[in-house]
Each structure stands twice: as structure tokens, then as C-alpha cells.
Amino acid sequence: MTNSKKSSNNSLKNHELYAIAETSGQQFWFEVNRYYDIDRLKAKEKDKITLDKVLLLKDKDSITVGKPYVKDAKIELEVVSHKRDKKILVYKMRPKKKTRRKMGHRQELTRVMVKSIKVGKPTPKSSSKKEETVKKETKPKSEKSTN
């Protein structure tokens, strides 16, 4: 019994830093030093990629939810390889007709490894007031006067 409690505590420690980000129209839960298969990216192996669309970020102390994205948060990925997923068979048949069609599809994937999850410090807003610009009052142009 005590071992199971320790293992549950260890699993919580593994999730001290994670981020949920959007890439290729899908949302992924990213953790540092883990591999993920995402839709094919136009990048070569060993290239570095940065994701800016971070929806949620959790570190040791807090959870930050973006509106819609977390400001100044980035995830750095490294492309490990390009591969193809297993084949998915699609079978179409029209009843009472002699029409049958069997097709297959293999999704193109890119395997990436998360190198780091970074949160930039927000820039402090200056307390100086904006200078108000005063428009000069211009007289409306009158129509040509006839003499």
C-alpha cells in the first residue's frame, strides 16, 4: 500500500511543468524531454521549432490560462524524424449495387521532442500618461461666395 502512494506522488512530480499548446489544428499536452507525433511539418531533421500558441501553462507554483493564448510563453521543439502512421482502410459499398471500393490512407507524421517550455517575463507598463493631442479647430470651408 505505501508503495502505491509513493508512486502516485512521483507521478505528480513528473507533471510539475507542462503546457497545452495548439499545433496543426490539434491540441497537445507537452512535457519536457518527451516525444510527440504531430502532423507533418515542413522542417528538416534536427531543426528547432518554436510554438507560440500556448493555451495553458502549469509550473510548480501556478496555472496560467490564456485568453486565448498565454502571453510570452513558448515551447521549443526539435524535429527527430519524419514517418508515416499505420494504414487506415476505408471500404465503401453501395447496397443493392455492384459497387465496392477499398482504399487506404497513411498519415504523414513528424516526430518531435520537447526541449524546453519557456515563459517570458511580461513587460511592465509605463505609468506615464499618454500625451493628449489637441486638434486645432478648423473652420469649415464655405462654399464659393458669389459677388
Swiss-Prot record:
<dbReference type="InterPro" id="IPR001787">
    <property type="entry name" value="Ribosomal_bL21"/>
</dbReference>
<dbReference type="GO" id="GO:0019843">
    <property type="term" value="F:rRNA binding"/>
</dbReference>
<feature type="compositionally biased region" description="Basic and acidic residues">
    <location>
        <begin position="128"/>
        <end position="147"/>
    </location>
</feature>
<comment type="function">
    <text>This protein binds to 23S rRNA in the presence of protein L20.</text>
</comment>
<dbReference type="GO" id="GO:0006412">
    <property type="term" value="P:translation"/>
</dbReference>
<keyword id="KW-0699">rRNA-binding</keyword>
<comment type="subunit">
    <text>Part of the 50S ribosomal subunit. Contacts protein L20.</text>
</comment>
<dbReference type="GO" id="GO:0005737">
    <property type="term" value="C:cytoplasm"/>
</dbReference>
<dbReference type="GO" id="GO:1990904">
    <property type="term" value="C:ribonucleoprotein complex"/>
</dbReference>
<comment type="similarity">
    <text>Belongs to the bacterial ribosomal protein bL21 family.</text>
</comment>
<dbReference type="Pfam" id="PF00829">
    <property type="entry name" value="Ribosomal_L21p"/>
</dbReference>
<dbReference type="GO" id="GO:0003735">
    <property type="term" value="F:structural constituent of ribosome"/>
</dbReference>
<feature type="region of interest" description="Disordered">
    <location>
        <begin position="115"/>
        <end position="147"/>
    </location>
</feature>
<keyword id="KW-0694">RNA-binding</keyword>
<dbReference type="InterPro" id="IPR036164">
    <property type="entry name" value="bL21-like_sf"/>
</dbReference>
<dbReference type="InterPro" id="IPR028909">
    <property type="entry name" value="bL21-like"/>
</dbReference>
<keyword id="KW-0687">Ribonucleoprotein</keyword>
<dbReference type="InterPro" id="IPR018258">
    <property type="entry name" value="Ribosomal_bL21_CS"/>
</dbReference>
<protein>
    <recommendedName>
        <fullName>Large ribosomal subunit protein bL21</fullName>
    </recommendedName>
</protein>
<dbReference type="GO" id="GO:0005840">
    <property type="term" value="C:ribosome"/>
</dbReference>
<keyword id="KW-0689">Ribosomal protein</keyword>
